A protein has these predicted regions:
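C-terminal accessory nucleic-acid interaction domains of nucleic acid-metabolism proteins
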Residues: 1-27, 31, 42, 46, ...
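Short beta-strand
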Residues: 52-55, 161-167, 207-211
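A contiguous, low-structure linker/loop signature
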Residues: 61-115, 122
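Signature for HUH/AEP ssDNA processing cores
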Residues: 94-166, 177-185, 303-307
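A short linear hydrophobic-aromatic micro-motif
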Residues: 158-163, 204-206, 348-354
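A short beta-strand motif that forms the metal-chelation/ATP-contact edge
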Residues: 172-178, 217-221, 363-369
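Acidic/polar low-complexity segments and flexible, solvent-exposed patches
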Residues: 296-399
């Protein structure tokens, strides 16, 4: 199957392949969806380099991450070389238009993961991103509450805030910014937002860096780091839900499950793109950087943490599993709980720390347990891991 888009030929292979087994949606359904929401979807990635997150065997299997553009690609597919903090470089695909977008979808990309910079200026982000990440047990109403406070903080400091569901458990708040500041400065501004949100809503929001110390909704500012990407507006997530741009008037009553591959087609036809004016509303970071200066260093961690040696957790953590898949890791957790039933009964939802870790080309899952609710004499020690997958080819024991 081939599509002609603005004079470019996009070949679609295996259009009838089922990508979402639960709903039965195929690759062609995914292609058709992105064509309908093209204006909004392209706006979310236009002129940006992207990391290719490829589900070549469907969303029920693990994706692999591909920074480098495929060697075999149409001559019209553009690339740009990015440098990473590790010192490595990669020529990444730049999405310019719908043809580029659909070409990446044909590779097995379900969601789109752009960097916060444009290809013509890779050192100065034009987007500030806040990712609201709830700990287990936190309700959607609390996430919405934190999102509204994040909006207030951004707008009080001269930026227009743009909300969207994440397509998963969380929520995203974006702001277009003038591309005049470095990654470090943008991250510092985002951290200032997080700390101010936490100050206003200490019972609900947290900006604490270490996962085991968090409660409520983590206002994640680190998505503004140079090597981080976030699923873009209108991205279909592996859950089958969509990262849906919203108007702020919709946020209090929204539910993530309302925005699916099917329902978004009707929504887009009826309401268009709530983010249509985003590119014309770029603002300055000066006020947020002044806020960061006034806040001073974080009291809960040193300004310049040591680069050598392992951090000693302040919470009583034990590591349970490192697995290639989440299912394997969760099965290991259940075996551990069966061996320690009295301990398992005392655990709160937020005490089970499930981390999706990014390896060289794929994700893997780490599970740790915080024993803070277990009396000290009854806490089991660190045991051999239930699953001991080593994504890097070296031993890294301990929590």
């Amino acid at each position: 199957m081939t599509l002609e888009l603005d004079g470019r030929i996009v070949k679609i292979t295996n259009p009838d392949r089922v990508v979402f087994p639960r709903s039965g949606h195929t690759k062609l359904d995914l292609i058709s969806y992105y064509r309908v929401v093209a204006e909004g979807a392209v706006r979310g990635v236009a002129d940006r380099p992207v990391i290719l997150k490829r589900f070549v065997h469907g969303v029920d299997r693990e994706a692999f991450f591909q920074k480098r553009a495929p060697a075999k690609r149409p001559e019209w597919v553009e690339v740009v070389e990015l440098s990473y903090p590790s010192g490595r470089t990669a020529e990444e695909v730049v999405i310019r238009d719908l043809a580029h977008l659909l070409w990446t979808v044909n590779l097995g990309c379900v969601d789109l993961n752009p960097h916060p910079v444009r290809a013509h200026d890779l050192d100065h982000p034009d987007e500030l991103r806040i990712d609201l990440d709830p700990v287990p047990g936190v309700g959607w109403e609390q996430i919405v509450r934190v999102a509204l406070v994040a909006r207030d903080v951004l707008e009080e400091h001269g930026l227009t805030a743009w909300p969207k569901t994440s397509g998963s458990r969380g929520f995203h708040v974006y702001a277009r910014i003038e591309p005049r500041w470095t990654f470090r400065e943008v991250r510092r501004a985002a951290e200032a937002v997080a700390r101010e949100v936490e100050r206003r809503e200490p019972d609900v929001a947290t900006s604490r860096w270490w996962k085991e110390e968090r409660q409520g909704v983590f206002v994640d500012y680190n998505q503004n780091a140079r090597d981080h990407t976030v699923a873009s507006a209108y991205s279909v997530r592996p859950t089958g839900l969509v990262s849906a741009p919203l108007a702020w008037s919709e946020v209090p009553g929204c539910r993530p499950e309302d925005f699916t591959l099917a329902s978004m087609l009707d929504r887009y036809a009826e309401t268009g793109d709530p983010w249509a004016g985003m590119d014309e509303r770029a603002g300055s970071l000066e006020a947020l950087l002044e806020l960061a200066e006034a806040q001073g260093p974080r009291p809960d961690r040193p300004a310049a943490p040591p680069r050598q040696g392992r951090r000693q957790p302040v919470m009583p953590l034990v590591e349970i599993a490192r697995a290639a898949t989440r299912d394997e890791a969760m099965a290991g957790l259940e075996r551990w709980k069966a061996r320690h039933p009295e301990v398992a009964r005392l655990l709160q939802p937020a005490d089970v720390l499930v981390d999706s870790m990014r390896g060289r080309s794929s994700t893997w899952t780490r599970i740790r347990v915080n024993l803070r609710h277990v009396p000290e004499p009854d806490r089991p020690g660190q045991e051999p891991l239930e699953v001991d997958y080593d994504p890097y080819g070296r031993d890294q024991p301990g929590p």
